[in-house]
């Protein structure tokens, strides 16, 4: 089948007569040579480019097109932003400004590299058992090349058994690399099955080196902390606020855009008493407390709250963080409630409580525009201000921040 790609779907795939064409661009003339059915969708598994779209650029990553990490790296960045604006208009029904990421390479502060007999890298798109071998990850930056080189030497010299995904065998499974972009501190976490990890300090001189053991049957890139070398935490800094990073704690993955995110949230809040729901490690709450707001935060994750309390201490601010689920917390008496839920959106009980107890302002931070649109329809509030931030260049994902009154 021959034709011209006219549009992308919401996942960033080109569409040609009902067939999804990954890594294509609007304006590409292509020939589809093979089609497979994937989860009830027809996907071009093999196609040939006849004439290139003017929207195309040369991807910086050599693994682009096979690696499942980036899907839009072949599109110029201005068009990536336009694609996200169009996507938001379709979902929300109105135009939303998309703030560009300050950096579009070297912006990610975390990557989880699988370590297998076939290579070190990320899963091939659509193939959980297959790893694309890489030398570096351009969206993370130059530290990734250094870490991968040292890892290969570590494995070879110490004769370490690595992962066979299909057989679920092998000792060393993942290397998780994290970096404070504003502090230049680096952490590496080796995730293994039961066994003994040789001393990595002869090969790695990063600020913090961890060894974690995944004792579950799940394929996850974290586990029980066995031991660490160097610093217990690394730090990231957003403006004048420091945050501790631990292997088992979450932090916004684009530090450069996270600065714009916390600044925007601080612009939108009103009053003095702030409730920080889904607070995590206190990213918003501590930034606001540093600016004199009276902050109380809640999260259902006990370790996240432990980290939030540590962040309170190192920043010398006055803020409280407690463990509680979104179904339990009263929002009464707060001037502004910040909600930053997981992709599933707000729990229905929280929606009812917000409608009943009526805080003056809700600042809604969302990584899923579709659940955001659903929740806003259920809330007895209107959108006073909204902006999108491109936290995830080269992917179809986008972050929303809205003030509801």
From Swiss-Prot:
Lineage: Archaea, Methanobacteriati, Methanobacteriota, Thermococci, Thermococcales
Source organism superkingdom: Archaea
Function: Catalyzes the formation of 5-methyl-uridine at position 54 (m5U54) in tRNA.
Enzyme class: transferase
Active site feature: 367, 399
Entries under Pfam families matching the protein: PabTrmU54_TRAM_dom, tRNA_U5-meth_tr
InterPro entries: MeTrfase_TrmA_AS, MeTrfase_TrmA_CS, NA-bd_OB-fold, RUMT_ARLMC_TRAM_dom, SAM-dependent_MTases_sf, U5_MeTrfase_fam
Protein name: tRNA (uracil(54)-C(5))-methyltransferase
Activity regulation description: Activated by magnesium ions.
